[in-house]
Amino acid sequence: MFFNPYLSGGVTGGAVAGGRRQRSQPGSAQGSGKRPPQKQFLQIVPRGVMFDGQTGLIKHKTGRLPLMFYREIKHLLSHDMVWPCPWRETLVGRVVGPIRFHTYDQTDAVLFFDSPENVSPRYRQHLVPSGNVLRFFGATEHGYSICVNVFGQRSYFYCEYSDTDRLREVIASVGELVPEPRTPYAVSVTPATKTSIYGYGTRPVPDLQCVSISNWTMARKIGEYLLEQGFPVYEVRVDPLTRLVIDRRITTFGWCSVNRYDWRQQGRASTCDIEVDCDVSDLVAVPDDSSWPRYRCLSFDIECMSGEGGFPCAEKSDDIVIQISCVCYETGGNTAVDQGIPNGNDGRGCTSEGVIFGHSGLHLFTIGTCGQVGPDVDVYEFPSEYELLLGFMLFFQRYAPAFVTGYNINSFDLKYILTRLEYLYKVDSQRFCKLPTAQGGRFFLHSPAVGFKRQYAAAFPSASHNNPASTAATKVYIAGSVVIDMYPVCMAKTNSPNYKLNTMAELYLRQRKDDLSYKDIPRCFVANAEGRAQVGRYCLQDAVLVRDLFNTINFHYEAGAIARLAKIPLRRVIFDGQQIRIYTSLLDECACRDFILPNHYSKGTTVPETNSVAVSPNAAIISTAAVPGDAGSVAAMFQMSPPLQSAPSSQDGVSPGSGSNSSSSVGVFSVGSGSSGGVGVSNDNHGAGGTAAVSYQGATVFEPEVGYYNDPVAVFDFASLYPSIIMAHNLCYSTLLVPGGEYPVDPADVYSVTLENGVTHRFVRASVRVSVLSELLNKWVSQRRAVRECMRECQDPVRRMLLDKEQMALKVTCNAFYGFTGVVNGMMPCLPIAASITRIGRDMLERTARFIKDNFSEPCFLHNFFNQEDYVVGTREGDSEESSTLPEGLETSSGGLNERRVEARVIYGDTDSVFVRFRGLTPQALVARGPSLAHYVTACLFVEPVKLEFEKVFVSLMMICKKRYIGKVEGASGLSMKGVDLVRKTACEFVKGVTRDVLSLLFEDREVSEAAVRLSRLSLDEVKKYGVPRGFWRILRRLVQARDDLYLHRVRVEDLVLSSVLSKDISLYRQSNLPHIAVIKRLAARSEELPSVGDRVFYVLTAPGVRAAPQGSSDNGDSVTTGVVSRSDAIDGTDDDADGGGVEESNRRGGEPAKKRARKPPSAVCNYEVAEDPSYVREHGVPIHADKYFEQVLKAVTNVLSPVFPGGETARKDKFLHMVLPRRLHLEPAFLPYSVKAHECC
């Protein structure tokens, strides 16, 4: 029992907890003197904390000071308290000379001349009447945290206007019309000479003015207003940080040096060890150094308890946070001791080497007393939830991590904590970051719309678990700390049936967590102190596993390399997708050439929120009805932006310089002559010059020659196809010939691309003007080549890992260029470029196929690449796939032997790869000579840097349809497959296992392979007359075994689990007849834990109308009781399929048509009606729907074997297995004893 004397309030002396007298830390309790009046707060305490085993909560308002107990010592929680655990002191003396520091995060803010910050007159001049301040957070070479305040960077954009003075007056007038809040600013207008990047031959933009405004908040509002009113403006959404990075060549992630500065001792804006002020001209980058200093990291996890016994909801006052675990560790350079940082010799030092906060870096915050959690774990005990949350936030502020991680913390843990603090306890969480709120500090997250959240809560009160948003859509911003949620990282990095922490721990760490059900957590927590220790160990292990995942995957190194390359803050790499990376890189490249990037206005464009604008004084969670660009996420790091879609897309609609994602452009750029002689921009289908709207085909696919190939199939693909096309053909905004171009161009210097609809796009060649995109790509490709060369020579594993992340960042960013030009709602779409890239890719694929057809079968050509031993001896001249072969004993021999006859043919082409079937050559010879063949094709057909590469050779291949195939690769174990059920996450393990066995027979058993080839050459009538080839019987035997396993209760429920992704909030689904939605509703009705948006929902198909285990069935723990659906169920109408899940009863003799049978299909019940949670099925012995599962088996096997089934106009391949499988009657379990007796009587 835990005695809590603080429920009555007003206690100032020692406290008794657990029967022990508590000692007060000197100076911490402030027992003497008058205490300032304390605002009351609500105490919520589980009753079981005070009375072991009791349920319920105790709620009480008190006016006393919040408290914490650490090692039996009472501590008052306040902002000026000294955290009691051991921690490494960072006593920093005044630094003399230049400061070299590594920056990892940046924020922008607007200060006014009367700001209370301690700014010297040297820099305060930049604040008249207001000015931008850019704060660079980082660490010095010795590991001290630092904040560098940079003054003097103005915000500017460009506008076409003939009268400079008049434009200044217009801007002053616009400043009075923009939305509130409006703040004072200084403005200057100067003429500029720049050229729009759109179009070759355009003149410099006439009457171009550079509008410079001291206040970024007002600069953005004024620029957007001018854009809305139709003024031709350029680069209005580029923030001052991006301006500084580009104009001064500063890095957003890497080493910098500040040469002249003022040291801040008093009036600091941040909580960093070092804070200095400098002018924008005093900050310089330190190039060619990709090393890291040591950064503090924090991994945390929370445990909650619902007052109603369901899954906890943050908005409900009874659903409280009961424990928080934290793991403090470091990442980056060498150990702190090696770098000469003192390790706390004042008696507060850490006991473990490299630990900078606590005895071992492991911390547990809990309500009530707690037993022994583990050796050297620092345990903090709190009387109530409010004090627990306040203690954690103070701990967070004291520790001041550079990186914060966890598992699904964006959508749950952080969101839960901030919701409780903001809406229940009215605490401003933003004051706990490295910047106080007044200095532009932010501690908040963007969440999806609250509208459907309310609908969800109304429809399912017990299901409103405060997690309606997907992780990808929730963006977290903490000033001075970068949040890396490992849940979306794992989803982007791996292909797994589910992404639970336990699954990822097994995959990456070879570890399993000791699981504790959320239903058992409340029971253990209220039991006693030892029960709370058990929950604490469970909570702590999650934080430890996430730390290990963080250090194993090393995503932070990869993101840091991209931030440095793309010149954007690290948090934007994590949350804002790929478009902003290309835009900023393009902006940087254009700045060197006096190019500018135009803006255009679209309906619905809103002024983006930025770091410098407070959304509300206490807004820790910002819910917006529509946050443009929320689709950008960590996943975007590992895939290209999608090609152009006809429907509007929210992909990466991010404007440079905004803290959130404002859609930068909607509609299609079309080009025409404008008043400036430059390129006009329009949202209409036709530009000013009358150019027709552009449409084009997407990814190139040659229709495959479906079938099973026992001959080797070589695969060739183009290396970095789309980037190489841009470089090879000089494609760019700046090389596109458009109406209004001033200079005539020699036709020999023009590269033309004609689309399928007859529209032609023309680009000047590199001899006339080098493409900006091409030069940027060339620079990055060369840089990647140099990095990979350094990797080969590097011996240091840490340095090698950093180089590997850098080359990967270069590769991913290069591959994003095509999507940048082709996404209609992107930041700078240019459909002529995207359409031309696609068309050139199609032409390259077609030319490759023709070249292979014309040359690869010619003896004189083959003689240059292959030797005598490379040919297959004994190839029949007449043995081709077109010749029909009868079953065994009926084949006719034809043709003699031709030892060196080779046939090569392209059987499939997919975007950037071609599949070539070779007859007459060994697989080993193709593997050895494949690179030489690819090099020869490249030299004959293409220009640099386009390169055709040899990828692999399939020894045998089943070509099912486009983007779906299975094959056995030469020199590799197992099968390579794409698009089949075996690699889909929705199929259950039982179906996958049967399909895998069938494929193993097909590819490993020679007799089965030959039988499959013979079967593919038979007609349906021949199969009816002669039967299937003998070797194919083995496949049928495996299917019969699978059918018996299902009907005779031999299959575990774990192997029958199906799944679907919850892609959006449940209230947004229009279809109610989806199995996973039905399962979520059943879980909500039982108040069980619900999945998050983005999770996979698992379910099992159960027998209709049955909810108990049938008598006589076996259940040995591993095997699950499975019921058999009676054939009479269909007659009664209980098996009525409305979702296409069932097929008609199999095994009709002689292929009897379905319409002649009166009975309904045996599997005709809707899937959503019989879908159930696997745990519920296992616990209650619910029988499964054997018919449906066997239909799934037949469908899966048919999908992979259909190319070898007999064809013809009257043949239905989906019914073939039903026809050839032997029939068998499965009785209900209740009838089995009678069937045995009848058998004995016979």
Curated annotation (Swiss-Prot):
Biased region (Basic and acidic residues) positions are: 1145-1155
Bias (Low complexity) occurs at 653-665
Set out the biological process GO terms recorded for this chain's protein. Answer: DNA-templated DNA replication; viral DNA genome replication
Q: Where is this region: Disordered?
A: 14-38, 644-665, 1109-1162
Q: Which InterPro entries match?
A: DNA-dir_DNA_pol_B (IPR006172), DNA-dir_DNA_pol_B_CS (IPR017964), DNA-dir_DNA_pol_B_exonuc (IPR006133), DNA-dir_DNA_pol_B_multi_dom (IPR006134), DNA/RNA_pol_sf (IPR043502), DNA_pol_B_thumb (IPR042087), DNA_pol_palm_dom_sf (IPR023211), DNA_pol_type-B (IPR050240)
**SUPFAM superfamilies from the entry?**
DNA/RNA polymerases, Ribonuclease H-like
Q: What does this protein do?
A: Replicates viral genomic DNA in the late phase of lytic infection, producing long concatemeric DNA. The replication complex is composed of six viral proteins: the DNA polymerase, processivity factor, primase, primase-associated factor, helicase, and ssDNA-binding protein.
Compositional bias ranges of the Polar residues kind: 1111-1125
Write down what this protein is called. DNA polymerase catalytic subunit
Q: Which cysteines are joined by disulfide bonds?
A: none
Record carries keyword DNA-binding: yes
Q: How does it assemble?
A: Forms a complex with the ssDNA-binding protein UL57, the DNA polymerase processivity factor UL44, and the alkaline exonuclease UL98. Interacts with the putative helicase-primase complex composed of UL70, UL102 and UL105 proteins; these interactions may coordinate leading and lagging strand DNA synthesis at the replication fork.
Q: Where in the cell is it found?
A: Host nucleus
Reactions performed catalytically? DNA(n) + a 2'-deoxyribonucleoside 5'-triphosphate = DNA(n+1) + diphosphate
Pfam families reported for this sequence: DNA_pol_B (PF00136), DNA_pol_B_exo1 (PF03104)
The record's keywords, sorted A to Z, are: DNA replication, DNA-binding, DNA-directed DNA polymerase, Early protein, Host nucleus, Nucleotidyltransferase, Transferase, Viral DNA replication
Family, according to the entry, reads as follows: Belongs to the DNA polymerase type-B family.
Q: Which Enzyme Commission number(s) are listed?
A: 2.7.7.7
Query: What Gene Ontology molecular-function terms does this entry list?
Result: DNA binding; DNA-directed DNA polymerase activity; nucleotide binding
Instruction: Please provide, in alphabetical order, the Gene Ontology terms of the cellular component aspect for this entry.
Output: host cell nucleus; viral tegument
Is Ribonucleoprotein one of the keywords? Answer: no
